[in-house]
From Swiss-Prot:
Reaction catalyzed: L-glutamyl-tRNA(Gln) + L-glutamine + ATP + H2O = L-glutaminyl-tRNA(Gln) + L-glutamate + ADP + phosphate + H(+)
Family recorded in the similarity comment: Belongs to the amidase family. GatA subfamily.
Gene that specifies this protein: gatA
Listed EC numbers: 6.3.5.7
Subunit structure: Heterotrimer of A, B and C subunits.
Keyword Ligase: yes
Active site, renumbered: K75 (charge relay system), S150 (charge relay system), S174 (acyl-ester intermediate)
PROSITE patterns: AMIDASES
Name of this chain's protein: Glutamyl-tRNA(Gln) amidotransferase subunit A
Xref: InterPro entries: Amidase, Amidase_CS, Amidase_dom, AS_sf, GatA
Domain of life: Bacteria
Function comment: Allows the formation of correctly charged Gln-tRNA(Gln) through the transamidation of misacylated Glu-tRNA(Gln) in organisms which lack glutaminyl-tRNA synthetase. The reaction takes place in the presence of glutamine and ATP through an activated gamma-phospho-Glu-tRNA(Gln).
Length: 496
């Protein structure tokens, strides 16, 4: 059952081969058996089965939503009524939200059944899921490796078939990089496409929710339910609802040859994504994927994104600045961790935050406070925002000669747990290919396309596909065509 796609699972429900309750029980047993992966931080079987029973009733009455009865796991950055909402932090270890995030509410309205909350880097700050107050997540493909971050619990859950789908968030690569490391498909939509209401904030001008699943087709189904305008989110974009499945299985150009479904597609290859720092085994997997695209009829076009190397310093000025502001609300007064002993109000603030936040979060708060301080704002934050606009302009220049841009999602495969913990800068460098996409607000996704070599032969590689604003449906079409021609996305870790 757990090897089936969302479409196949829904067909099984409609054919009464199984019930939503039986499906939920199946996944709950798998989650319990795989506790060593540490992919989930909160599971409540009673709540899950109650939702499944409601889905069965809706299916029986013919009132079911398009995703009715299908299980999903939610990254613990989305607040959920009934389940704890911790953002991977001691600060919120016992926080119970009185409402559902819009993403959670929309998926529930479509009939999906919540399996639980997945582990994550604290407040979404990290690239390895080692920064969680609840311990690191293990990569199902190689349990000595990280699953990526910050949506590492979600990527591990989907890869290990503990859930057929999961929600994630992406601020600088936190859907795409863990999708790459865990061999699953994940998409970060255009900024503003998916509501941030009820998403615990890290960097408000960058945060964006999106789906993670086995395939592009599954992600398209999920995005149909997740995306859309939300008046409760000031950054939500007012656009007509779309069917993100509408191009799947179709030729890129009208009247196209079935043997060359992507004839006419121009794929831009940035020179900056294939230079020094890209591991040989990752390069080999990406090159092989690009050859598949050529066989499907696509044309490869050289493009340039000259400010790529500046995306790391720009991001690590802007994101910490916004984080320092967003996280100032956690003071031990209204909600969150409060120190047990303190002398006065100021001491309570200090001790509550010192005890509640982990080291990486503290590091970014300090950096953010510094770059926003008097005398440094113009030199750092203002300059970073100017370069951010140039990065966005570079992408628009590139899109004049191509339809999508491709390259690696990460310069390496997943590294060993603990390998980069003492050097945060090395961790930051791993996001070199994803940060600029986030800074520009563009949609990007990662698709499994192979594995590393030698000692890394069990560690997946992801191909990043970048589209222009609001081109998600076309990106999903491009990814789906690749997945129809290959089987990387259906391969499973040993023992699954």
């Amino acid at each position: 059952m757990h090897a089936k796609s969302l479409t196949e699972l829904r067909a099984a429900l409609d054919a009464k081969e199984c019930s939503a309750v039986e499906l939920a029980q199946h996944y709950l047993k798998r989650i319990d058996a795989a506790r060593d992966l540490n992919a989930f931080v909160h599971v409540d079987a009673e709540l899950t089965l109650a939702q499944a029973k409601a889905a069965d009733a809706a299916l029986a009455n013919g009132e079911a939503g398009p995703l009715a009865g299908l299980p999903i796991a939610h990254k613990d950055v989305f607040v959920t009524r009934g389940w704890r909402s911790t953002a991977g932090s001691k600060m919120l270890a016992n926080y119970a939200s009185p409402f559902d995030a819009t993403v959670v509410a929309r998926l529930s309205a479509a009939g999906m059944v919540t399996l639980g909350k997945t582990n994550m880097d604290e407040f979404a700050m990290g690239s390895s899921n080692e920064n969680s107050a609840f311990g690191p997540v293990k990569n199902p493909w190689d349990t000595s490796a990280v699953p990526g971050g910050s949506s590492g619990g979600s990527s591990a859950a989907v890869a290990a078939r503990l859930a057929p789908a999961a929600t994630g968030t992406d601020t600088g690569g936190s859907i795409r990089q863990p999708a790459s490391f865990a061999g699953v498909t994940g998409i970060k939509p255009t900024y503003g496409r998916v509501s941030r209401y009820g998403m615990i904030a890290f960097a408000s001008s960058l945060d964006q929710g999106g789906p993670m699943a086995r395939s592009a087709a599954d992600c398209a189904l999920l995005l149909n339910a997740m995306a859309g305008f939300d008046e409760r989110d000031s950054t939500s974009l007012e656009r007509a609802d779309e069917d993100y499945t509408r191009h799947l299985g179709k030729a890129w150009a009208a009247g196209g040859d079935a043997g060359k479904p992507l004839a006419g597609l121009r794929i831009g290859l940035p020179a900056e994504y294939f230079g020094a720092g890209l591991a040989d085994d990752v390069r080999a997997a990406i090159d092989a994927a690009l050859k598949t695209y050529e066989a499907l009829g696509a044309t490869l076009v050289p493009v340039s994104l000259p400010k790529t190397e500046l995306s790391i310093p720009v991001y690590y000025v802007i994101a910490p600045a916004e984080a320092s502001s967003n996280l100032s609300r956690f003071d031990g007064v209204r909600y969150g961790h409060r120190a047990a002993e303190y002398r006065d109000l100021l001491d309570m603030y200090k001790k509550s935050r010192a005890e509640g936040f982990g080291p990486e979060v503290k590091r970014r708060i300090l950096v953010g406070t510094y770059v926003l301080s008097h005398g440094y704002y113009d030199a750092y934050y203002l300059q970073a925002q100017k370069i951010r606009r140039i990065i966005a302009q570079d992408f628009q220049e590139a899109f004049k000669s191509c339809d999508v841009i491709m390259g690696p999602a990460s310069p390496t495969v997943a590294w060993d747990i603990g390998a980069k913990g003492d050097d945060p800068v090395q961790m930051y460098l791993a996001d070199i290919y994803t940060l600029s996409v986030s800074l520009a607000g563009l949609p990007g996704m990662s698709v499994p396309c192979g594995f590393g070599a030698g000692a890394n032969a069990k560690r997946p590689v992801g191909l990043q596909i970048i589209g222009n604003y609001f081109d998600e449906a076309r990106m999903l079409q491009v990814a789906d065509a690749f997945q129809r021609a290959t089987d990387w996305h259906v391969q499973e870790p040993a023992g699954v």
